[in-house]
């Protein structure tokens, strides 16, 4: 599923996005953010992060630099290392 989503995003970036004027208010662009989020966090969480990001893309949000959050270590979530 992850590879299919990545292919769809790449298709969008290469063939669909160039047909419209660039007007993304964020860096990286929403499609690049989605690609990075899926690669970093997997299909489910990456898609969730992408949806959250796209919902922020409106005229009342200032935009700017908004990187994909780094993946947390499993041990940093309160789990003991044995």
Swiss-Prot record:
Main location: membrane
Entry GO CC: plasma membrane
Keyword Cell inner membrane carried by entry: yes
InterPro entries for this protein: Membr_insert_effic_factor_YidD
Subcellular localization(s) per the UniProt record: Cell inner membrane
Disulfide bonds: none
Entry keyword set: Cell inner membrane, Cell membrane, Membrane
Topological type in the membrane: Peripheral membrane protein
Region (Disordered): 61-82
Role: Could be involved in insertion of integral membrane proteins into the membrane.
Family from the record: Belongs to the UPF0161 family.
Official protein name in the record: Putative membrane protein insertion efficiency factor
Organism name: Fusobacterium nucleatum subsp. nucleatum (strain ATCC 25586 / DSM 15643 / BCRC 10681 / CIP 101130 / JCM 8532 / KCTC 2640 / LMG 13131 / VPI 4355)
